[in-house]
Amino acid sequence: MAEEILVARDGVVATVTLNNPAKLNAVNASMWRRLRTVMEELSVDDSLRCVVLRGAGEAAFAAGGDLEEFLTLRDTLERALVYHEEWVAGALNAVRNCLHPTVALIHGACIGGGLEIAGACDLRI
């Protein structure tokens, strides 16, 4: 299985790619958790000046959350609250609180959870 959150650096710019193109970069639970970790790590990296977030491929930035998980990881109120209050909110807060400017490089569909990620960025292009 390919990495679902890719990180590349080009000098003072880090690019974080949501890498689930077969599902239009729909964000699943492991991606939400990994996005939080990656953004927290990049935030404290003093060698950076900017973090760009994008979707893999040309079809979508992110087409929301992975709908298959509604039946498995969000099937009860308790599990849905953990999913959203811990995993989704944790990732969005990590993007929002990044010490470096964040840019959502939007190409293609950007809805649901993808729109939330873009909205948490400082700039959207």
Where are these regions (language model features)?
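Hydrophobic/aromatic residues within transmembrane alpha-helices
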Residues: V16, L53, D66, I117-G119
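Short, flexible helix/strand-to-coil boundary loops that buttress conserved ligand/catalytic motifs
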Residues: V27-N28, G65, R74, I106
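Short beta-strand/turn micro-motifs composed of small residues
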Residues: R54-G55, I106
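Glycine- (often His-adjacent) and acidic-residue-rich active-site loop
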Residues: G55-A91
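Glycine-rich beta-to-alpha active-site loop
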Residues: A91-I125
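A short, glycine- and basic residue-enriched loop/turn
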Residues: P21-L24, E58-A59, G64, A109
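Conserved CoA-thioester-binding segment of acyl-CoA-metabolizing enzymes
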Residues: M1-R54, N93
